[in-house]
Amino acid sequence: MNRLRAGRPLALALLASTGLGAAVVLRPQLLGLPVAQVDLVATLVAGLALTTAALLSPRRLLSAGFLYLLMLILFHLSIPVVLALGGTLPVTFAAYIGTWYGSSDVTEAVYLSMLAVLALTTAYAWVQVRRGGNRPAPHPPAPTPPAFTRIGAVLVAAGVTVYLGTLVVVAPDLLRGGSYQEYLDTVGGTRTVAGATLVVAIGLCMAAVGAPGRARTLAWLLFGVFTLVTLSFGARTAAMFPAVAGVVAAAACARRVPRARTSVALIVAGLLAITVVQQVRGTGLAGAGPAAVSLNPMGSFAETGGTLRTVAEVVTWRRTYQEPPYHGRTYLTPVVRAWELATGRPRPPGNQDPRYAGVLLYQRYPDFQLGFSPVAEAFLNFGSTGVAVLFAGLGALLAGFDRRRLGHLGAARLGVLMYALSYTVRNASNAVPLTLIAGLLVIWCAARLLNRPPRPARRPVPVPA
């Protein structure tokens, strides 16, 4: 039995490698399959990837690798998975995907998404094998300073206050059950809301790594309020991505591996929240009664997978319109814009700069509300080879973090990284540099502040006799 367990990581790594090799070698055959068979293959790939990540990481279902894979699959492969499993789609969404799903470009989009999942899983598995399976790190890190947790709680409180204050001043109807469209028309995408959400995420990553106490409890309670408010008008990712980052950070420095029941309960609760929010975001809570809400997740999961269409559109640009590869330009745009700002060169506003992949998509399809996709951006820049290399690198990076138990600083940094990666699951990469710089800088400043040596006590001035 022990030999069987010892050989499991190697077997999973070989299985993932076989899947990746088959996807590369059999690419023409896969692209020529009927849609129903492509959906079935995508379902098998998703199951293999999630099983591999869950079994190889010491933190199981709360590892960074597993949760990132889950989100990547949820936003890119949930349509083919739901269709393969015979799930029932909402009438309006079924009519919507009927206008584009099933073409050869969509088949290649599904293939590219599977390639990304397999590349990430394979790299993740081999790093785990190289580091010796799923044994936990032997040396526990030092405890988190209470002041570090309190700083995180203060940041969460500040971010939630700014976010709610903005809603009260600019869009009070959202607090009375407004819809997601009202959110987009008023405060969605504004710098204030985006900045407040980032502050909440950074603060939550810092507070989550602390020991149980008032500060950590307060941070999670405030984030709970933030979650209820954002979910009430359908802004699901505003709460989802910080929550994933906070959970990953907390698990990364936990003294014990979270119980399977706890992990499953957290994931199921998150998926059910997505199910409910997906159904009420069109009308808001004010226009949705209990009879309009169903806990059957299949339709909601499929709607979440609409990000796949952004991949299909980029495939159309490259294949049908012969658009040349961008060779990394969209990834370098934040750096170029920062240089233009520093040197005083003219530049368009960020939401109108077509050098950003998401802006380019919006300018070509103004009715889209799908953000973008890391798979689409990698393919736009470097083709299918770029997709495989990029996601293999991500898999190796996440496996390196998941292999060992981190101290409070390392876990908080992992949380910030997870937030940046989560954000790009359905968006372009333009916010990643600022997110990482801001988060890592705040954590560094907090650590320096807490590690300053105390000032020496002043010597009393002698009083003359």
What does each model-found stretch correspond to?
Residues M1-P136, G246-A273, N430-A447, P456-P464:
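N-terminal "leader" segments that precede or initiate the main folded domain
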Residues R5-L15, R60-L74, I151-G152, G213-L221, ...:
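Membrane-interfacial loop-to-transmembrane alpha-helix junctions, especially the N-terminal start
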Residues R8, L12-A16, V25-P28, G234, ...:
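Conserved luminal/periplasmic juxtamembrane motif of membrane-embedded glycan-processing enzymes
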Residues S17-R27, M71-A84, A158-T166, F223-L231, ...:
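Aromatic-anchored segments of alpha-helical transmembrane domains
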Residues L33-L40, Y96-Y101, A125-R256, R261, ...:
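Membrane-embedded catalytic interface detector for glycan/lipid assembly enzymes
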Residues V41-L50, M114-L118, G159, L167, ...:
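Hydrophobic alpha-helical transmembrane segments
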Residues Y180, L272-L394:
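Small-residue-enriched transmembrane helix-hairpin modules in multi-pass membrane proteins
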Residues D367-A465:
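Hydrophobic alpha-helical segments
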